[in-house]
Amino acid sequence: MISSKTSFIALIGNPVSHSFSPIMQNAAFQYLGLDLIYFAIPCKDEDLELVLNSLKKINCKGLNITIPHKEKVFNLCSEISPIARKLKAINTLKLNSENEWSATNTDLEGFIYPLKNLNLAKKKSIVLGSGGAAKSVIQGLINLNLSKISVIGRNKSSLDELIKNFGNQIELHSFLSNDNQTQNLIEEADLIINTTPVGMKTAKNEMNLLPYGDYFWRSLNSKTIVYDLIYNPAPTHLLKFSANKGCMTIDGLQMLVAQGLKSLSFWTNGLEVPFHIMNDALKNHL
């Protein structure tokens, strides 16, 4: 029950109305018996500094940061973890002993969670998209020791940014729907990860589309694991299509829950919740 002593943790971004984080985090707080609530706060770019400075002065114990603020929040933090610096993105904050924001990124651990036991070392992978989410995915694949990481994207500037970050650890390919080289990559891939928004429920007219179009996927075969970071709808059109091809599929819910567990541990100095507590709360909501 909320009382005058209840503290809070919030999600800051724009938009935030689609987020499932309040559902799973409040389930975790209830499981742990914490006098905490979690809710989402929409915040425009120009208000970010004001909002974060204001939250220091009230009973806020931590934050999640989502798009479009994951990079812009750097200048408002006094302590930043090595992984957040490496990825140039922050998704979790807490107030330190000096009442300043300490920051980390839990997306990497969230992404890896459903892949840990799949023995992907020395396997070949494709990352679709070159935006912010691709950075966590690529670093995760490097950590899992995959032998080949091919990135297929449309945006030259963001592809160039990935090369600055990861150098010769990745191969870049501009999107061409009739590109035979791309089809060879798809045919040999052991793992394909979609980091684009195509297929997301909130993406206008894109929910029933495949990333890069149907023709792009003509060489997909059943040995490939297909991982879609999108979690709403579940399953996405891509995962339904891939399952019909006989592929193992992974949806974004597992990543969402796993990164949420790591954020919770960061806020509470090490408290842990069983995976199923958050996962069941989300599935009941869906």
Curated annotation (Swiss-Prot):
GO terms for biological process: amino acid biosynthetic process; aromatic amino acid family biosynthetic process; chorismate biosynthetic process; shikimate metabolic process. The active site is at K70 (proton acceptor). The keyword Oxidoreductase applies. Pfam families: SDH_C (PF18317), Shikimate_DH (PF01488), Shikimate_dh_N (PF08501). GO terms for cellular component: cytosol. It is an enzyme of class 1 (oxidoreductase). Pathway: Metabolic intermediate biosynthesis; chorismate biosynthesis; chorismate from D-erythrose 4-phosphate and phosphoenolpyruvate: step 4/7. CDD domains: NAD_bind_Shikimate_DH (cd01065). It catalyses: shikimate + NADP(+) = 3-dehydroshikimate + NADPH + H(+). Its EC number is 1.1.1.25. NADP(+) binds at G129, S130, G131, G132, A133, L229, G252. Shikimate binds at S19, F20, S21, T66, N91, D107, Y231. GO terms for molecular function: NADP binding; shikimate 3-dehydrogenase (NADP+) activity. Keywords: Amino-acid biosynthesis, Aromatic amino acid biosynthesis, NADP, Oxidoreductase. Involved in the biosynthesis of the chorismate, which leads to the biosynthesis of aromatic amino acids. Catalyzes the reversible NADPH linked reduction of 3-dehydroshikimate (DHSA) to yield shikimate (SA). Belongs to the shikimate dehydrogenase family. Homodimer. This is Shikimate dehydrogenase (NADP(+)). It comes from Prochlorococcus marinus (strain MIT 9301).
